[in-house]
Amino acid sequence: MAKAYVLITEDVKDPDGMAEYGKVASQTMASATLLAFDQKAEVIEGTWHGTQTVLLEFESEEAAKAWYYSDEYQAAAKLRQAAADCNGVILHGLG
């Protein structure tokens, strides 16, 4: 089964709100591996949205979706969405 990745870009408007999000969201991420958290991503082509980028790895697309759509994470996501303008995608690994 191919791994899946969640990539989220965030243009942070409320740092305190994002800090609260981080506390709540971290409690939901047992099934994820944090691969990257970058506040200074180097744009090598085109334009990039956001002041920080997060890349999470999951064992499968199903695991990524189960985490993202869970009641626990959706409660946390509301905090993130209130504190930042965000974009997110699920990427499908090879394999």
PLM segments and residue spans:
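Short S/T/G/P-rich N-terminal loop/turn motif that feeds into the first structured element of a domain
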Residues: 1-52, 59-69, 92-95
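Generic beta-strand structural signal
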Residues: 52-54, 86-87
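C-terminal structural segments of small proteins and small subunits
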Residues: 61-89
